[in-house]
Amino acid sequence: MDKVCLIGGLRSYIGLTGGVYRHVPAELLGAAVLKAVTEKYNVVPQQIICGNGVGAGGNIARLAALEAGLPESIPAVSVDVQCGSGLEAVAMAAAKIEAGEADVIIAGGFESTSTQPRRGYNANHPDYKGEETYSVAKFMPGIHRETVMLEGAELTAEREHISRAESDPWVLRSHKLAAQAAADGALSDIIVSCFGAVRDEGIRPKMSQRLLDRLPCVLEGGRFTNAANACLTNDGAAFVLLASEGYAKAHNLAVQAKVRHSAAAGGDPLVSPKSAILALNALLQRAGLSHTQIDCFELNEAFAVIDVLFSRAFPGHEDGYNVFGGALAYGHPYGASGAIILLHLLKSLQKRGGRFGAASVAAAGGVGTALLIERC
């Protein structure tokens, strides 16, 4: 891709489930950040593409766009690749601009686990037990022996021989870097405060090895996955502005980076964390680059096993990896996370003076999504 410019973007503070955004529906949280992006850059996008992971409504992107006060003439598309939805939304937007189908698009995503919908069964469903039969909507229900993300992390640790001793330093590192970034205001220019939020609620500045040693496995019969090496569930929103070179020049928009390539990869759903590495490999192959040519990496560390897998597959990148900490500290608002890590990646490149940056997300079901940018 030579024509796709990354102008910038914004994210909300990231709230805990039941935290500061506990009464805020997903579309309103998304709308607040979406509106802030249009105002910051003084643009009216030609399309909105939004990721959302837990099905907050039919074409929730359209609802968020209308709630943000955007003209009815602007179409909006919702994307569901579970945890990778926000990054896939950006990849889709870049492809549309590269193909000449649009000149300016806002893409990203949002999530409210606090107001996560509940699913009701009708009389034709085998689980129907009367009018009061409800369950929380969940990732990939029913596939592959009901394996969910926690079990996927546990199985990954078992198959890849990852110990808590190997993963604990990554947990400590994530909270330390995130706490330092918050104290320094390193990300303040990409954060918009809304609905009374004043901080990222998941960061624990006092996280310690002593605390980690006391945490039991959260799975019956398990040995690895605990409340610290698995990410929090969260509420949040993030969007980026993409434009063609011609549009950016005509509207005097400063270009911060170019979107160069995107890639997706599928793997074993039972060990879904590995899909982030599969997607990175596919991205590097498509770009014709070695991992040694990438200055900064940003992975959505939903589990510490992802950090360990990355360090084994791409050694020597600790200084340029998740420079401001990752999801083990900030948390993981599913549909927003891809856009969040892209914004953090851009800030990392600027801080370190790097050229190429790669972002990757592993998603429920064993699908990975990755994106390559080049700082201008």
Predicted regions and their residues:
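Buried hydrophobic positions in well-ordered alpha/beta secondary-structure cores of metabolic enzymes
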Residues: 7, 45-48, 86, 93, ...
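N-terminal extracellular/periplasmic Venus flytrap/periplasmic-binding protein-like
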Residues: 11, 23-32, 166-250, 318-320
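Active-site pocket-shaping loop/turn-to-helix segments
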Residues: 11-38, 54-55, 77-91, 103, ...
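Conserved beta-ketoacyl condensing-enzyme motif
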Residues: 22-84, 88-97, 102-104, 110-129, ...
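Phosphate/pyrophosphate-binding loops at sites that engage ATP/ADP/AMP, CoA/4′-phosphopantetheine
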Residues: 35-46, 156, 160-161, 248-255, ...
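Conserved catalytic cysteine-centered active-site region
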Residues: 52-102, 143-148, 206-232, 313-340, ...
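Active-site-proximal alpha-helical scaffold in enzymes
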Residues: 81-111, 157-187, 240-246, 333-354, ...
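Active-site pocket-lining segment
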Residues: 260-329
